[in-house]
UniProtKB/Swiss-Prot annotation:
SMART domains: RAB (SM00175), RAN (SM00176), RAS (SM00173), RHO (SM00174). The keyword Transcription does not apply. This is Dexamethasone-induced Ras-related protein 1. PANTHER family: DEXAMETHASONE-INDUCED RAS-RELATED PROTEIN 1, MIP08469P.
Length: 281
């Protein structure tokens, strides 16, 4: 599919873009109020930090990538720290593919909320996949934000290690500062590696392109695809091979669309398992 045509469809008046389910993912950010969830999202999308605090009800963003000739869609769901609607919280978890749980190092209550959230994610996902929570694989990182306020720290390192466990493939922990932009790139790289997604999705590993440069992006994507077909590389992780565009006016999908998304993902996972069972060694 031509990337120029793709970007034209990103306007709200046009129909939804059709990208294969295997290339569509959703990143969900969860945590208490005032821990810095929106600041992390802002760093991810724009590289900027907004010092003013505005309470989030629920913010939805969408980003498209061209990576080595493939087009990817990443939805970003910035959830509310207050959850008056448990059903919506559960739906957010069900539709999530990768998770960032955020607490503030200077707020013990927010750490305890992350403990509850992690358990809720494991319980919800294990129910969906018909597995025990010990066996369900959910790409998840826990972030202790406000590392620049270490003097006011209320959470002990040993408690964090106990929560995270000793398997970095299941859960990773990062102490970050969204304000100082500290350790965020490493955190995103680890999360995408855990989910087996292209590392170029991390903000520091692709070029940011605005919508008005879609023709340039399309030409570069075609060039990279031709190089790949010719066996000339393109898979080395060079930022020149990857481009990202934040979709303007992205709208949260309807509940019906979310339910269809869950169904499609579950069906794709089931088919992959069936293929594994049919392999003759």
């Amino acid at each position: 599919m031509k990337l120029a045509a793709m970007i034209k469809k990103m306007c709200p008046s046009d129909s939804e873009l059709s990208i294969p389910a295997k290339n569509c993912y959703r990143m969900v950010i969860l945590g208490s109020s005032k821990v810095g969830k929106t600041a992390i999202v802002s760093r991810f999308l724009t590289g900027r930090f907004e010092d003013a605090y505005t309470p989030t009800i629920e913010d939805f963003h969408r980003k498209f990538y061209s990576i080595r000739g493939e087009v990817y869609q990443l939805d970003i769901l910035d959830t509310s720290g207050n959850h008056p609607f448990p059903a919506m919280r559960r739906l957010s978890i069900l539709t999530g593919d990768v998770f960032i749980l955020v607490f503030s190092l200077d707020n013990r209550d927010s750490f305890e909320e992350v403990q509850r959230l992690r358990q809720q994610i494991l319980d919800t996902k294990s129910c969906l996949k018909n597995k025990t929570k010990e066996n369900v694989d959910v790409p998840l990182v826990i972030c202790g934000n406000k590392g620049d306020r270490d003097f006011y720290r209320e959470v002990d390192q040993r408690e964090i290690e106990q929560l995270v466990g000793d398997d970095p493939q299941r859960c990773a922990y990062f102490e970050i500062s969204a304000k100082k932009n500290s350790s965020l790139d490493q955190m995103f790289r680890a999360l995408f590696a855990m989910a087996k997604l292209p590392s170029e999705m991390s903000p520091d590993l692709h070029r940011k392109v605005s919508v008005q440069y879609c023709d340039v992006l399309h030409k570069k994507a075609l060039r990279n695809k031709k190089l790949l077909r010719a066996g000339s590389g393109g898979g080395g992780g060079d930022p020149g091979d990857a481009f990202g565009i934040v979709a303007p006016f992205a709208r949260r999908p309807s509940v019906h669309s979310d339910l269809m998304y869950i169904r499609e993902k579950a069906s794709a996972g089931s088919q992959a398992k069936d293929k594994e069972r049919c392999v003759i060694s």
